[in-house]
UniProtKB/Swiss-Prot annotation:
Active site positions, chain numbering: 78, 96
Sequence positions that bind NAD(+): 130, 203-204, 227, 231, 252, 279, 322-325
Molecular function via GO: mRNA binding; saccharopine dehydrogenase (NAD+, L-lysine-forming) activity; saccharopine dehydrogenase activity
Chain's gene name: lysA
Cross-referenced InterPro entries: AASS, AlaDH/PNT_N, AlaDH/PNT_NAD(H)-bd, Lys1, NAD(P)-bd_dom_sf
NAD among keywords: yes
Protein name (Swiss-Prot/TrEMBL): Saccharopine dehydrogenase [NAD(+), L-lysine-forming]
Keywords: Amino-acid biosynthesis, Disulfide bond, Lysine biosynthesis, NAD, Oxidoreductase
Source organism, top-level taxon: Eukaryota
Family: Belongs to the AlaDH/PNT family.
GO biological process terms, semicolon-separated: lysine biosynthetic process via aminoadipic acid; protein import into peroxisome matrix
Classification via Gene3D superfamilies: NAD(P)-binding Rossmann-like Domain (3.40.50.720)
UniProt GO cellular component terms: cytoplasm
Catalyzed reactions per annotation: L-saccharopine + NAD(+) + H2O = L-lysine + 2-oxoglutarate + NADH + H(+)
Amino acid sequence: MGSNKIWLRAETKPAEARSALTPTTCKALIDAGYEVTVERSTQRIFDDDEFAKVGAPLVEEGSWVKDAPKDAYILGLKELPEDDFPLEHVHISFAHCYKEQAGWEKVLSRWPRGGGVLLDLEFLTDDAGRRVAAFGFSAGYAGAALAVKNWAWQLTHPEGEPLAGEKPYANQDLLIQSVKESLQAGQKQSGKSPKILVIGALGRCGKGAVQLAKDVGIPESDIIQWDMEETKKGGPFKEIVEDADIFVNCIYLSSKIPHFVNVESLSTPSRRLSVICDVSADTTNPNNPIPVYNITTTFDKPTVPVTLPNGTQGTPLSVISIDHLPSLLPRESSEMFSEALMPSLLQLKDRENARVWKQAEDLFNQKVATLPQTA
C-alpha cells in the first residue's frame, strides 16, 4: 500500500499558479528517500528549474495519465480536468465531490471504476479533528483584498462597469500596495473608510480577511468580527445589510443554516451593503447561506451582480465567488500549505499505519458507498 513515489502533476485550472509542493518541500521529501517526479508547468509560481535544482526529474505536463508508475501517488491541488476515463492511481488533491456538489457522482465514480483511491486534502485531519493543511488564511486574505478593491471600484465607476480582472501577485507586498491605492481612490469619492463585516472571524479564513483589512489601513473600529456567538440566533441579519459596506463570508459550511442574507433582506431601502465576498463559495450547495447568486466567478471576471426586485433603490451590489482565491498569492499560500502538509506526506511510505491517511481512505470508501448505481 505505501509507496515512496510521488508525482506532482501540473495544475490545469486557469490562473491556478499554486503548487502542492514547493522546491523546499520537494527537496525535503527527496532527502527523506522519496522519488519525486515533477510535471513541467507554465503557470506554476515556481519555475521548473527550481525543482530540477533540488534533484527532481521533470516530465511533460499531464504525462501522469500514461507514464506514472501504478504505485505512484498523484499529487495536485485542484480538481482534475473533466473527463471520464477510470482512475487507477491513488490521488491526493481537493476533488470537491464529498458534499454532493453539482456532478459529484461523475467525479467520484472514476476512482472505483479504475481501482484507484482519492485521499482528499480537504478532509485530512489531526488527532483533534483540525485540518492538517488548509489555504484558509490565504483565501480570506485574498478575498478581502478583492472585496475592498471592488468597493472602491464601484465608487470610481458609477456607471456600473464590473471590476476589472486580476492576475496573481508575485508577493504579498505588491497586493497590499495595489489594495491601498484602490482604497484611497474609494475614500476620496466617499469621504470615508468602508465598514467590513467578517463572519467566521475566529477561524483561519476569517483571520486572514481581518488581517488584510488591518494591513491596508482600515481602522479596527470599521472591522466587524462575527463568529458563532453572533450568528447563533439565526439570520437573515439586518446588521450585514444596513451596517456594513463589505460582507466577507468565511464560514465552513457543514450543515443547513438560516440565510445570512437573501434577496428579500437585501431589498430594503436602508441597505448600505455593496459588496459580498463569499470566500466559502458554496455556490452549488443547496445549503448556501447566501442564496443571491448562482455562478462561481473567476479572476478574469471577479464579480457577478445581484439581481434585486424592480424598483429596489440603493447602490449596486455584487458578489465575488471565486473558488480558488489563494491563487491570488500563489507563492506565500503554497509555502504555507506545503509546509503544513509535509509531516503527513512523510508518512506516505507507511500509509497503512498512518492515522491521517487511513482515515482519509475510510472516508473515501464511505463516500463511494453512497454513489448511485448508475454513476
